[in-house]
Amino acid sequence: VFPDLKLSGILEGLCGQFQVEKVTSNKTGSRIKVYIVSKKLVQKEQLFCLEKNIKEQLFPKSNVEIVIVERFELSEAYTPQNLFEVYEESILAEFKADNDLEYNLFRMAEVTFPHENVMNLKLPAAFVPEMVEQKLKEDLYNIFAHRCGLD
């Protein structure tokens, strides 16, 4: 998709793990979204690094924002609990990049799995606006259900 993109090491190998489904741009051209699908988990920090490389190499003088939208087709061996164990740092990295409040709430939350497919999230005792709590739940649901294919 980006023939002029030069990657090395981990990023080069990373690109072999996924397929680009489509590339879109908003009307002003200020944001380009690259939709990828992978049969393996790709850590969010690696995708942030790939976004940065695309921006720096292909759009160095532009204010365009590059966003990689990932989707995983994982094996049925993944449950919410074992996915969380290997993907927690990526969830934290995503929250940190998007919303400091969500990041700090999630970082301080107590996460338990009373059943393999049920996640309980106990937020800190501090006052948390209901809309922030709801957004955190929605974001987690989107990560587990839509991105990773677990319901």
Residue ranges: model-predicted function:
Residues 1-151:
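Intrinsically disordered, low-complexity basic tails and flexible linkers associated
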